[in-house]
Swiss-Prot record:
Domain of life: Bacteria
Gene: rutC
A GO term for molecular function: deaminase activity
GO biological process: nitrogen utilization; uracil catabolic process
This protein's GO CC annotations: cytosol
Name of the protein: 3-aminoacrylate deaminase RutC
SUBUNIT field: Homotrimer.
CDD domains, per database record: YjgF_YER057c_UK114_family
Assigned protein family: Belongs to the RutC family.
First-level EC class: hydrolase
Amino acid sequence: MPKSVIIPAGSSAPLAPFVPGTLADGVVYVSGTLAFDQHNNVLFADDPKAQTRHVLETIRKVIETAGGTMADVTFNSIFITDWKNYAAINETYAEFFPGDKPARFCIQCGLVKPDALVEIATIAHIAK
């Protein structure tokens, strides 16, 4: 099965040569996602909960465009700029995964824009 490019309606053009997601063999791979507006400006500077919510809503759009749901998420890679935001990010993250939680990792690192606090890349298995 060839891969399909997943670009939800209203998506902004990425800052680099990539797409929001790809679908191959029933697996959705969602690119690293930040809290950007349509012009790739960071939204909600200094608000880790709002950034996390925006990131996960964007990820949900990619997965739903591919035909899945957030319940299909099997793995998240989480990148944060400061451990002081870890609890706030987890609080919002848990709202999107109320049942069985996906596997994940979380590391502290620098991100592509100074006001970005969290970036998440996701894998979801939607094959039935």
